[in-house]
Every structure is written in C-alpha cells, then in structure tokens.
Amino acid sequence: MGAQLGRLLIVDDESAIRFALAEYFRGVGWSVDSAAEKEEAEALLACTAYSVVIADLRLTGVHGIEGLDIVQWSRHLRPETRVVLLTGNATPEIEAEARRLGADAFLQKPLPLPQLEAIVQGLVRES
C-alpha cells in the first residue's frame, strides 16, 4: 500500500458501524482511530491531529443539539480538522446549527461508503 491519506477519527456508538467505517477507510489508505462515546472522542482530539472527524450526531446519552458538541470541541482544539456529521434523524434546524458551528458536511444515513469517501477526500483537498 502507498502513503497514507491522512488520519481519520470515527465517532459512533454502534460498534458495527464504527467497525465498517474503520475497515473501509483503512482499506483505501487512511490511518483510523475510533471512539464509541463523546468523552472518548474528546480525549483523542485533545492529543491527536486528525484530517477529518466523522461523527454520528446521536451517541448514547447524547441527543439533538447536544450532539453538535463534537463540532465545537473539534473547532476549538483543532480548527484545521474537517468535521463530517452523520445522522439518521436530521432536522433543518439542527443542520443549520451544525453548519453555523462549523460542520463541513451534514449527511443523512445511510450513505454509500464510496460516496462518503468522495466527500471526505473533497474536504481534505479543499483544506
């Protein structure tokens, strides 16, 4: 395999989704870390520079607007990190707030992995 494309953090409380995303992105050349909960993601962000964070908006114990904390935390600690939010329950209000806080992409689940990869690659090229 050639050079790695960058470092990616995947945040999702569903282990099957976390595993599938991690395996897919590793397979196309990314270095991948993953977190199951908000606190774990924040700890990783505090000590590691990521090219992109892909986070589920709803984690265990985190719902609605509270799920946007990952955007604020990422922007505060690592302004250069691109943030992609995934959700199965989008509302126009939450999407607008996510974008206002600095989310680079707000995507509806399910999303084909090649399409997600293309979005991530585009964000990295833009930065």
Task: Map each language-model feature to its residues.
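Acidic, metal-coordinating helix/loop segments flanking the phosphotransfer/catalytic sites
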Residues: 34-52, 76
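The short loop immediately C-terminal to the conserved phospho-acceptor aspartate in CheY-like receiver
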Residues: 58-61
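Short amphipathic alpha-helix used as the core "switch/output" element in two-component signaling
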Residues: 43, 65-79
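Alpha4 helix (beta4-alpha4-beta5 surface) of REC/receiver domains from two-component response regulators
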Residues: 65, 69, 90-107
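Conserved acidic carboxylate
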Residues: 12
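Two-component/phosphorelay signaling modules centered on CheY-like receiver
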Residues: 15-33
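C-terminal output helix
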Residues: 93, 111-120
